[in-house]
Amino acid sequence: MSRNSGTTLEDGPLHADPTTEAPNNATVTTNVTANDENTEKEVDADAAAAAPAEAPKPNQGFRFWAIVAALAFTALLSSLEGTIITSALPKITADLGGGNSFIWVPNGYFLATIVMLPLMAQASNLFGRRWLTLISVATFTLGSGICGGANSQAMLIGGRVVQGFGGGGIALMINIILTDLVPLRERGKYMGIVQMVSAVGAALGPFLGGLLTSKSTWRWVFYINLPIGGTSLVALFFFLRVAKPPPTTLAEKISRIDFSGNAIFIASTVSVLIGVTWGGAVYPWSSFRVIVPLVLGFFGLGLFVVYEWTVAKNPSLPKDIILNRTAATVLGVTFLHTVATYWSFYFMPIYFQAVKGETSFWSGVDTLPLFAGIFPFAILGGMLLAKFGRYKPMHLIGMAIITLSFGLFSLLDQGSSKAAWACFQLLFAVGAGLMIAILLPAMQAPLPESLVALSTGVWTFVRGFGTVWGVTIPSAIFNNQCRLKAADLSDQGVASHLNSGKAYQYATKDFLDSIHDDATRRQVVELFTSSLRTVWYVGVALAGFGWLLIWLEKEVTLRSKLNTKFGLEEKKKAAKADEDVESASA
């Protein structure tokens, strides 16, 4: 088949390639790149450079851009909520009480965002993308209302869980819909656009949370989502018109859902996240209350894989995804990339507060090169993928830069200049940004388009799981290093705070200001600096392992045309009209 055969998604009716025959029930056709058995095709770099294939552009009419804009606005909604709670949480806890249960305010949201991903991915194939997206936004908005009106910690946590179900659905459906609308080679570019808008919400969150809490009430941290969610619902309702799956009975659709597998997955994931949430915050990591949930959870996840591959009739985790070398490798790289990204997100602010002695507000300002710098490079990475059709070189370059950046972070101390810490953060942003929007297209490259939804669900879960460990691992390292070094402090009263395994909570300007003896304060700053240095050293090892792992990827030719049942609805109607005209002419 010719590389440019098939149909393109462009204005006007779709026309089939006259050299090919399409079955009567064909969907939007494509130039499938020789992957009937999920085999992978190495790209000859010299040949690719000599004769680059030009990917046809997706439809860029009003409907297309309206959908992209609506998805970006919806991403802004969920990303804003992910960070706005951080600066408001102390005030919320003071008003509602609840003791140690406050940790479930952020973690309950996160837990809910990932446990339903495989089920929702499978359901999107059976019930279509549009209504699941609308339900996700509505659920998120409902949860925001519950949180805003909460009169107890339990009600607030319940509202956060409802929010999380919606937020997880939003993240998943945005990625799935983008894969439906644009060819594989073009996806990174549009994912970069959506993620850049999402970054605006993530960057504004802490500032808005502090502003609303100080000028009004913490309840507006949640109420602000109501008009945003309502606007998003209206935009999606009118513009998100994508094709529906083939009509079947409700009973038949329900029978094709992997309820047993998803039950195992949900229970196992909850168990793991309970252990992670309690570890080091409520109980020591050595406590059986932490170890037992972790062991049961990881055992359950292994059982889930076995069940999916041996028993499930309609698995939500098909073998083809995990047993494909490149897809599995990219999943591993995605996990490590996410861990590294959140590693820096959570511990660069610690450097500014615990070493440089800055307030949380100014540490937020000083980390702008990191937070805001990633996403312009995400767009650049997507554009380079669309231009050259190659992801492995950018993965290698990106992870190498991340590894180097962690090494440079280890050089930072109290006397480091603004130029040093700003440039080091920006360098990390270049590496992380180049990769962030092209990981999903790389993972889907060797897989058939029929696995788009399920593979997106798996990839989104791996990213979410990486977020957990991107905070947990460096926190455990930092707390342990502080505990070991606290014995050398001259003031044992100060040492008692840092050797309890909760040093992360004391890595603030307020804690430093509470130490009146200058010599002790200098000792504590050096303790924090040394402990952070170890955190960055481990980050170097982790990112270096990720760089080595990338060499297992194969460079698979990226499909430049769509092959989906869920493209723009109007285009499918136009294609059907063309078929009717051709039949009448015949």
UniProtKB/Swiss-Prot annotation:
Species this chain originates from: Acremonium sp
Region (Disordered): 1-56
Transmembrane feature ranges: 65-85, 101-121, 131-151, 164-184, 192-212, 220-240, 263-283, 290-310, 330-350, 368-388, 393-413, 420-440, 458-478, 532-552
Family stated for the protein in its record: Belongs to the major facilitator superfamily.
Keyword Membrane: yes
Record-given protein name: MFS-type transporter ucsD
Chain's role: MFS-type transporter; part of the gene cluster that mediates the biosynthesis of UCS1025A, a member of the pyrrolizidinone family that acts as a strong telomerase inhibitor and displays potent antibacterial and antitumor properties. These compounds share a hemiaminal-containing pyrrolizidinone core fused with a gamma-lactone, giving a furopyrrolizidine that is connected to a decalin fragment.
Residues bearing glycans: 25, 31, 324
Entry keyword set: Glycoprotein, Membrane, Transmembrane, Transmembrane helix, Transport
Lineage of the organism: Eukaryota, Fungi, Dikarya, Ascomycota, Pezizomycotina
Gene Ontology MF terms: transmembrane transporter activity
The keyword Membrane appears for this protein: yes
Record gene name: ucsD
Record's subcellular location: Membrane
Comp. bias intervals (Low complexity): 19-36, 46-56
Topological relation to the membrane, as annotated: Multi-pass membrane protein
One Gene Ontology cellular component annotation held by this UniProt entry: plasma membrane
